[in-house]
Amino acid sequence: MTNNKTYFVANWKMHGSLNSVNSIQNVIKLSKKAKYKNVRIVYCPPYTLIRQFVEKTKKTKIDIGAQNCHFENKFGSFTGSVNANMIKNIGSKFVIIGHSENRANGDTNKSINLKIKSAIKANLKVIFCFGETLKEKRNKKTNKVIAYQIKKGLHKIRNIKNIFFAYEPVWSIGTGIIPKINELDKQVREIKKITKTKMRKFSTEVQ
């Protein structure tokens, strides 16, 4: 998705309690400043706090998202799972799909594709994560890996206007290796090229 706004996404992971919700007040005040008029903030707390954050952020420039969803949109026997419709129903506007930690815990390109389809059907905006490992980077497979993840993740998806492409260099997470700005710029350009090639016949949203 492209527009003239800058998005900052705060993934809370498995952190936070009811007492944490009030911490957003300072961010709300900051977001009202004129210099941040083109900035949107997305908070992605645990499921247990989504509703509370939704209530706190009404009539602000802060949106609330979930950190994952099940690929099945109907109710069913999926213990411990939450689907996209349930997330949407409590006020969430975004959902993170394909995060490296979830990939490491069993998410596949196939399940990610099904989750994205499910989220789009529920009218959620998708933060689609992808990225290469340190081994893949060292073997100079970055572009190949990313192209494959994007291709499989967006299989048979024609409308990408509500998909945010989130490059997540797995090799920099917890390793102390910080990617250089020019390195990230180069990779973002490559990702745009990949997405344009993949979606050219379906959409003109990628710029």
PLM features: residue spans?
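Active-site loop-to-helix "anion-binding N-cap" substructures in soluble metabolic enzymes
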Residues: 1-207
